Amino acid sequence: LGLNQDYDLSYNFSPKDLVIVGAQRGHGKSFACCNMAVNAQNAGRSVLYFTIEMDQRPILQRMCSMATGVPLGRLIKRNLYEKEWKRIGQWWADRFDGGSEVLADWNVAEDFDKFHYALTRKCELKDKAQLDVFYDPSLTLAKIISTVRQKKIEYPDLGMVIVDYLNQVRRHNAPSRSGQYEWTEQIEISKGLKALAQDQEVLVISAFQTDPKGQVRFSKGIEDAVDASYT
């Protein structure tokens, strides 16, 4: 997964597993999820990434930084060396059929936005080893399930689904009776994600928010459905 060397040596997950990764707010859950997504893509598998708090742009920026080795802070500010611009341009081009041909027509360091516009208009995304980011601030379990089923057809090599993060996924669009983090709902979400992993034969990774002691309320119920929990 790419969490750390010891963890990767200790666990061997199957395509039907549910793994949850816990941390406090602001302690790197999304960074860990992005790192796992990039590692899966590097291994030749497509990844579907559901995000609730951040939209597609910052998620893809993090993935691009990790994949190219370009520091995220300078990538965001566009304060880059020409060789770094070339690596970023190649990363984007590699996601599209015919992307390298489009890249050859542009000086990415001077015209990245125009290059990106031409790339997305002239080329289609590849149907393999893809990173697909789905942003929905009102994400529900039903939406996750329907989207994964659709994308499994679009990307036959879909190997990982990431949900960032479990605490904020809802069963349906109606507001929770007990507030945003109603624990019985979280238990049902956990069970639903495990059922999805088994039904679609994909590894499902979900971040979850913990308290300062590294625990989540009624965590035993949530963890009953998971194959591994990492905090």
Predicted features, each with a name:
Residues N4, D8-S10, N42-P156, G214, ...:
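Cytosolic-facing regulatory segments adjacent to core modules
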Residues S14-A23, R45:
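Pre-Walker A (Motif I) flank of P-loop NTPase domains
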Residues G26, T184-T231:
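Phosphate-binding/switch region of NTP-binding enzymes
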Residues A32-M36, I59:
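Hydrophobic positions on the alpha1 helix immediately C-terminal to the Walker A/P-loop
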Residues N35-A43:
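Walker A/P-loop NTP-binding motif
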Residues K77-L80, D132-D136, R171-I187:
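Flexible beta-alpha connector loops of hexameric P-loop NTPases
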Residues L166:
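Conserved Walker B
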